[in-house]
C-alpha cells in the first residue's frame, strides 16, 4: 500500500487508490514532470514482488502493452521499479468500465453495442498482429471515456496471478465467465480464444447478463464446452438475426466454426445491421464433433491408493497331512499365466467398482445439480412456489417491459430455465412491467423537468432523452418549445429512439428593429418583453410640427444592431412632442387677412392672442391695410400659449376738403 500524498518514483504524486486487481494495486497520481497530468499507476502487490515468475510476467506484459499505440488501447507511459516495487504508469481514463456501464444501461441499443465492439476489435487486431493474445478479455478490462470511446487494458498481466497460484480458484471467477472452451479444457489460449471472449462480451451488452453462470469456476467452465449458447433474440427481440449470427459464430465451440481472425469478425459485424441482411437465417453449427476434444489426464496413483482397502476373502482347504503345510518363506511354484491374468482382471474390476462406489457416495453427500424449471408466463407467486418445490431459493425480482408477457407475470429467470444449478441456489425473477409502447403527448409549453420525469416514469432511458436549448424572449426559461416526435406518435421502448426536446433558455442577445415612426409606448413594452432593463431605455423628447406627439423620430443603436441584454448598453429613443414655441415669421408688407390666417393656422397662435392696431404713419411706399409693424419681431421665439402678437396696420389720415 502506497501512502496517499507520497511522491512515488520521483515524479508521481499519489492522489488516491482507484483499483485493486488480482496481483496489483492501482492509484490515481499526478505526473509532476508533465505539469500535473493525471495518470494511473499500477504497482505489483508486495507479496508478488519476490516471486520471479510474477515479476517477469508483469514486466514482459507491461513492455508488450507499451508497444501497442492505439486510440482504443490504454497507453503505457512509464515502466520501472521503485524500492523493489515493480510499477507501470498509464493514461488515466476518467469514466466507467464496460461491466458497470452495461449494468446501468442494459440492454444497450444495437447501434451502440456494435460501435463499442468495433472499437474493441480494432484494438485487438493491432495486438494480434503484434503476436499478443490478451487471454483475459472481459468487460472489467474495457474502459469507456465520457464521450463513449472504448479502451482495452490489462493485456494478460493478471494471468501471472493464475500462473503462480493455481490453487486460488475463486480468483478466477471474474474471468471464467468469458473463458473459451479450449481454455476450459486446458489448451493454450489463441487469437480465437480472444474472439470467443469478445462474443460473450457482445452477448452481455445486448442482454444485460452473461450466458453461463454457476457456483464454482468448474461449473461455469463445463457449461462453456457443454451447453449451447442461449438465444440472444429470446432475451432481446430488437436484435436482428444477422447480429445474433455474429455472436453465434464468435462463440462457436469448435475452432473450425469460429472466426479465424478479428478482421473477419469486424467485416461481418460491420454489415450486420444493413438492410441487405434483414432476412438472414439463423446460423446453426454441428458442435457434436470431438475434433477439438482434449483427453483428460489419467488418475494419479496417489488418488488410487487413497481408496480404502478391502480384505479379499479366500477359501482355505483343510490340510490333510500337516507335514505338507508350508510357511510364508516356503517356496511355492507360480500359478499358470492364464490364472494370473484372471486374478489381475478380477482385482482391477473390484478396484473400479470401489472407485465408482466411492464417487457415488461422495456425490450423494453434495447438493444435487438439477435443471431450473421454466416458469415463464406464471405469476410471481406461482413461480416462487414452482422454484421452491424444486428446492431452489428465491433471489431478486427485477421488472422489464414486454409486449408479449402480461404485466406481473414472469418473463424469464436468471439463470435461465433449463440451466443446471445446485439445490438451494438463489434464482432471480424478471417480471413483466407491461407493454413496451406508449403514446407521445403534447409537451410544448410544459416545464421540461415535468416532461422528463413523465418520460422516465414510462421507462424511457435517460440516454434517449435529449435536451437542446434555444434562446427565447417569449417563453420562460425551461419551457418546452418544440418536440421531435409529434403528439400521438406510438413510442416503442424496445427501440432506441431518441426524444429531442427543444427547451427555452434566457436570451442574452436580440436584434433591434426599426422603431422610427412607431409609437414610443409600444416600442418600450416590446423591449421590456425582450428583457431589456427599463433603466437602459432612455426617452428624449423633441418638438416637431411634422410628427404626431409620441412618435419615435430617431433611435440609437440603429435598426438591425445585435443587442446584448446582459450588458448595460443604453437604448436612446427620440420622441416627437407638440411644438410650444416657434420663431416669429416676418409679416411686414403682408395684408392683414394673410397675416391672421398664417398666425392661426400655420404658426399656431390663438386668435385671442392676436391684437391688431391701426397706425397713421408708415414708411414711404406703404399702402393702406398693409402690415407695417409687428411684435414680436421676425425671428424672435414665440410661446404659442402665452405670447400676445401685435400687428400694426397702416391707416392713413383722412384730410377734410377745404371749403
UniProtKB/Swiss-Prot annotation:
Upon gene disruption, the observed phenotype is: Cells lacking this gene have a significantly reduced growth rate in the early exponential phase, exhibit an increased rate of autolysis at the stationary phase of growth and do not achieve the same final optical density as the wild-type strain. Their growth is almost completely impaired at 40 degrees Celsius, in contrast to that of the wild-type strain which is unaffected at this temperature. The mutant strain is also more susceptible to oxidative stress, to osmotic stress, and is less tolerant to acidic pH.
Instruction: Give binding positions for ATP.
Output: 18-26, 42
Would the keyword Phosphoprotein turn up in this protein's UniProt record? yes
Q: Where is this region: Disordered?
A: 541-561
Write out the annotated subcellular location.
Answer: Cell membrane
Induction per UniProt is:
The phpP and stkP genes form an operon.
Location of the PASTA domain: 366-433, 434-505, 506-577, 578-651
> Which residues catalyse the reaction?
136 (proton acceptor)
Q: Which InterPro entries match?
A: Kinase-like_dom_sf, PASTA_dom, Prot_kinase_dom, Protein_kinase_ATP_BS, Ser/Thr_kinase_AS
Q: What is its main location?
A: membrane
Give TM regions: 343-363
Share the record's PTM remark. Autophosphorylation occurs predominantly on threonine residue(s) and weakly on serine residue(s). Dephosphorylated by PhpP.
The processes (GO biological process) annotated in the record are: division septum assembly; establishment of competence for transformation; regulation of cell division; regulation of cell shape
Q: Which residues form the Protein kinase domain?
A: 12-273
One of the record's GO molecular function terms? protein serine kinase activity
The pH response of activity is noted as:
Active over the wide range of pH from 3 to 9.
- Cross-referenced Pfam families, in alphabetical order? PASTA, Pkinase
Please, what other remarks does the record include? Strain Rx1 is unencapsulated.
Q: List, alphabetically, the PANTHER family matched.
A: MITOGEN-ACTIVATED PROTEIN KINASE KINASE KINASE 20-RELATED (PTHR43289), SERINE_THREONINE-PROTEIN KINASE YBDM-RELATED (PTHR43289:SF34)
What is the documented function of this protein? Protein kinase involved in signal transduction pathways that regulate various cellular processes. Likely senses intracellular peptidoglycan subunits present in the cell division septa of actively growing cells; thus, intracellular unlinked peptidoglycan may serve as the signal molecules that trigger StkP phosphorylation activity on a set of substrates. Plays a crucial role in the regulation of cell shape and cell division of S.pneumoniae through control of at least DivIVA activity.
| Protein family per UniProt | Belongs to the protein kinase superfamily. Ser/Thr protein kinase family.
Record remark on domains: Consists of an N-terminal kinase domain, a transmembrane domain, and a C-terminal domain containing four repeats of the PASTA signature sequence (Penicillin-binding protein and Ser/Thr protein kinase associated domain). The C-terminal domain binds to synthetic and native peptidoglycan (PGN) subunits and to beta-lactam antibiotics, which mimic the terminal portions of the PGN stem peptide. Deletion of both the transmembrane domain and the PASTA domain negatively affects the stability of the core kinase domain.
The name this protein carries in UniProt is: Serine/threonine-protein kinase StkP
Q: Please name the source species.
A: Streptococcus pneumoniae
Amino acid at each position: 500500500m502506497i501512502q496517499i500524498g507520497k511522491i512515488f518514483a520521483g515524479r508521481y504524486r499519489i492522489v488516491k487508490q482507484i483499483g485493486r486487481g488480482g496481483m496489483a494495486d492501482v492509484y490515481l497520481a499526478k505526473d509532476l514532470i508533465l505539469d500535473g497530468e493525471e495518470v494511473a499507476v499500477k504497482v505489483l502487490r508486495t507479496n508478488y514482488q519476490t516471486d520471479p515468475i510474477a515479476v517477469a510476467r508483469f514486466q514482459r506484459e507491461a513492455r508488450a502493452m507499451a508497444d501497442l499505440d492505439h486510440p482504443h488501447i490504454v497507453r503505457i507511459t512509464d515502466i520501472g521499479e521503485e524500492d523493489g516495487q515493480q510499477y507501470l504508469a498509464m493514461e488515466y481514463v476518467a469514466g466507467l468500465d464496460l461491466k458497470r456501464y452495461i449494468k446501468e444501461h442494459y440492454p444497450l441499443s444495437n447501434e451502440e453495442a456494435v460501435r463499442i465492439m468495433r472499437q474493441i476489435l480494432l484494438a485487438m487486431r493491432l495486438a494480434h498482429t503484434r503476436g499478443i493474445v490478451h487471454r483475459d478479455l472481459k468487460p472489467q478490462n474495457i474502459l469507456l471515456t465520457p464521450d463513449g470511446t472504448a479502451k482495452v487494458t490489462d493485456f494478460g498481466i493478471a494471468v501471472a496471478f493464475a500462473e503462480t497460484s493455481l490453487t486460488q480458484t475463486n480468483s478466477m471467477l471474474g474471468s471464467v465467465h468469458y473463458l473459451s472452451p479450449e481454455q476450459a479444457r486446458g489448451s493454450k489460449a489463441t487469437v480465437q480464444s480472444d474472439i470467443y471472449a469478445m462474443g460473450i462480451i457482445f452477448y452481455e451488452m445486448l442482454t444485460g447478463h452473461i450466458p453461463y453462470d454457476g457456483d464454482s469456476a468448474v461449473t461455469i467452465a463445463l457449461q462453456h464446452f457443454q451447453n449451447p449458447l442461449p438465444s440472444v433474440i429470446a432475451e432481446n427481440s430488437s436484435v436482428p438475426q444477422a447480429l445474433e449470427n455474429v455472436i453465434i459464430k464468435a462463440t462457436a465451440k469448435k475452432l473450425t466454426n469460429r472466426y479465424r481472425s478479428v478482421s473477419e469478425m469486424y467485416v461481418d459485424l460491420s454489415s450486420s445491421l444493413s438492410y441487405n441482411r434483414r432476412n438472414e437465417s439463423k446460423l446453426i453449427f454441428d458442435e457434436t464433433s470431438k475434433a477439438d476434444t482434449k483427453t483428460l489426464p489419467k488418475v494419479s496413483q496417489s488418488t488410487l491408493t487413497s481408496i480404502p482397502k478391502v480384505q479379499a476373502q479366500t477359501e482355505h482347504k483343510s490340510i490333510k497331512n500337516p507335514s505338507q503345510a508350508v510357511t510364508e518363506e516356503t517356496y511355492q511354484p507360480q500359478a499358470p499365466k492364464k490364472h494370473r491374468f484372471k486374478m489381475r482382471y478380477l482385482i482391477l474390476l473390484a478396484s473400479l467398482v470401489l472407485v465408482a462406489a466411492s464417487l457415488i457416495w461422495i456425490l450423494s453427500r453434495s447438493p444435487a445439480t438439477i435443471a431450473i424449471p421454466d416458469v415463464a408466463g406464471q405469476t410471481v407467486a406461482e413461480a416462487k412456489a414452482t422454484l421452491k418445490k424444486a428446492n431452489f431459493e428465491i433471489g431478486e425480482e427485477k421488472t422489464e417491459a414486454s409486449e408479449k408477457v402480461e404485466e406481473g407475470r414472469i418473463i424469464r429467470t436468471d439463470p435461465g430455465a433449463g440451466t443446471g444449478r445446485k439445490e438451494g441456489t438463489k434464482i432471480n425473477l424478471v417480471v413483466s412491467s407491461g407493454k413496451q409502447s406508449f403514446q407521445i403527448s403534447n409537451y410544448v409549453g410544459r416545464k421540461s423537468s415535468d416532461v422528463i420525469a413523465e418520460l422516465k416514469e414510462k421507462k424511457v432511458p435517460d440516454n434517449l432523452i435529449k435536451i437542446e436549448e434555444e434562446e427565447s424572449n417569449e417563453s420562460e426559461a425551461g419551457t418546452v418549445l418544440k418536440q421531435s416526435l409529434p403528439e400521438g406518435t406510438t413510442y416503442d421502448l424496445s427501440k432506441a429512439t431518441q426524444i429531442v426536446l427543444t427547451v427555452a433558455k434566457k436570451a442574452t442577445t436580440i436584434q433591434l428593429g426599426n422603431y422610427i415612426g412607431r409609437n414610443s409606448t409600444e416600442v418600450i413594452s416590446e423591449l421590456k418583453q425582450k428583457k431589456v432593463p427599463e433603466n437602459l431605455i432612455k426617452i428624449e423628447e423633441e418638438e416637431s410640427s411634422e410628427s404626431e406627439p409620441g412618435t419615435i423620430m430617431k433611435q440609437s443603436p440603429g435598426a438591425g444592431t445585435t443587442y446584448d441584454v446582459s450588458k448595460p448598453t443604453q437604448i436612446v429613443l427620440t420622441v416627437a412632442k407638440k411644438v410650444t414655441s416657434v420663431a416669429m415669421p416676418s409679416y411686414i408688407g403682408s395684408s392683414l387677412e394673410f397675416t391672421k390666417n398664417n398666425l392661426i393656422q400655420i404658426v399656431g397662435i390663438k386668435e385671442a392672442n392676436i391684437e391688431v392696431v391701426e397706425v397713421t404713419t408708415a414708411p414711404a411706399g406703404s399702402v393702406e391695410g398693409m402690415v407695417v409693424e409687428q411684435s414680436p419681431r421676425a425671428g424672435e421665439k414665440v410661446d404659442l400659449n402665452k405670447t400676445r402678437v401685435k400687428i400694426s396696420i397702416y391707416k392713413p389720415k383722412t384730410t377734410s376738403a377745404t371749403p
